[in-house]
Design a protein with these regions (language model features):
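C-terminal active-site subregion of NodB/CE4 polysaccharide deacetylases
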Residues: 2-99, 106, 137, 141-145, ...
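Extended, charge-rich helix/loop segments that form flexible
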Residues: 27-33, 37, 135-225
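Short, basic/glycine-rich phosphate-binding loops at helix/coil junctions
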Residues: 43-46, 174, 198-201, 229-234
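A short alpha/beta connector and helix-capping loop motif
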Residues: 110-128
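A short acidic, amphipathic alpha-helical/loop segment
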Residues: 110-114, 218, 283-287
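Active-site neighborhood of phospho(di)ester-bond hydrolases with catalytic His/Asp-centered motifs
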Residues: 125, 230-232, 297-299
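Short beta-alpha junction loops
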Residues: 128-131, 301-302
């Protein structure tokens, strides 16, 4: 839902653009480049309730983004190349690496035609339960329930709770509240909670999750393209910080093993599910390195530094807010001017 905070942030980015600040910042302070994080790419919708709008861009905006990055003299590179530039001496040109999380079906139907037309490399991170047809996109199911109902009830902490959601602001408020609650649950409890909610309100969790996700045939098409890097995002896409260490390591290693078996190639790159600061911890970076990944991408914003100053197993990414359509705002963000300087990375095992 649009907010005063979002408006002020956008206004600040526009002001920064016209102030010339991105061009006054030194080349070293701007980093070697940026890794950009996208999720869904699909045509704009007219629905008033779109709690995941910030996670979506249109194919037209993806096209504008790629054209702009080229115009701004960014080299659009693969994840392998991004990791190499992160440890080398600074290059005269900055890079941009395009990544897509979630394994959504619209990547193949809406994003891939745009990416192919521009002949640019990109990385897609796959939680392998979803192409297997057994993943649970609980955030989509929650959206479907709240969008359709004016009153819902569910069991929270062993107590029946009821919520009136007669208008759109109330729907947004409840969605945010329940997402925060569900993200705090251990995976078995989260699965039980969303299945109970879907049963009560006749939302087909399994069908919805399958329909929203690429299957293995879609992924095989992508894997056949030399410009596409297939990465892993665990098996079930859990909040790793809610798991015991042994379970988290199993999710990380099994996700890689399943993907490698499916594509008959090494899977070198990983993305933390959700990826924000609360969803993973330092020990998970060590696990990703132990599992054999060359990189592990977060959703923590920042630029990638050269000369080894960025920890490749805590790789920052710029998650673009799909509610923003200003390329001026994007140019400010990719300049690095909005991010604090990065301290030299230490080995994850230290």
């Amino acid at each position: 839902m649009p907010s005063d905070h979002g408006f002020l942030t956008s206004l600040g980015l526009e002001f920064a653009y016209f102030s010339g600040l991105p061009w006054l910042r030194g080349r070293r302070a701007s980093g070697a480049g940026v890794v950009m994080r996208f999720e869904r790419v699909r045509p704009a919708r007219a629905a008033r309730f779109q709690p995941l709008r910030s996670h979506e861009i249109t194919p037209e905006f993806l096209d504008r983004t790629i054209r702009a990055l080229k115009r701004w003299k960014f080299d659009i590179v693969s994840m392998d190349e991004a990791c190499q530039r992160a440890v080398r001496l600074a290059s005269p040109r900055r890079f941009a690496c395009l990544t897509f999380d979630g394994g959504y079906k619209d990547l193949i139907t809406s994003a891939y035609p745009v990416l192919s037309r521009h002949d640019v490399p990109f990385t897609v991170y796959i939680p392998t339960a979803f192409p297997d047809g057994v993943g649970e996109a609980w955030w989509l199911a929650l959206e479907a329930v709240i969008a359709r109902e004016t009153r819902i009830s569910l069991v929270m902490d062993r107590r029946e709770q009821r919520f009136d959601i007669a208008n759109t602001p109330e729907k947004y408020q409840l969605y945010d509240f329940l997402v925060d609650w569900m993200r705090s649950l251990a995976p078995p409890d989260l699965s039980a909670a969303i299945k109970d909610l879907c049963t009560r309100y006749a939302v087909g969790l399994s069908a919805l999750s399958r329909d929203a996700s690429m299957d293995w045939s879609d992924l095989a098409k992508l894997a056949a393209d030399p410009l596409v890097t297939i990465g892993s995002a665990t098996v079930n896409y859990p909040v790793l910080s809610n798991l015991k260490d042994a379970d988290a390591l199993r999710e990380i290693t099994m996700g890689r093993a399943v993907a490698q078996a499916a594509f008959h190639r090494e899977v070198r790159h990983f993305a933390y599910p959700f990826g924000d600061r609360g969803s993973w911890r330092r020990q998970h970076a060590a696990m990703a390195e132990e599992a054999g990944f060359a990189s592990a991408a977060s959703a923590i914003p920042g630029v990638v530094e050269s000369e080894g100053r960025t920890n490749l197993h805590a790789l920052p990414r710029i998650a673009w807010d799909g509610r923003r359509r200003s390329l001026r705002a994007m140019r400010v963000i990719v300049s690095g001017v909005t991010f604090a300087p990065v301290k030299r990375a230490r080995a994850t095992g230290a």
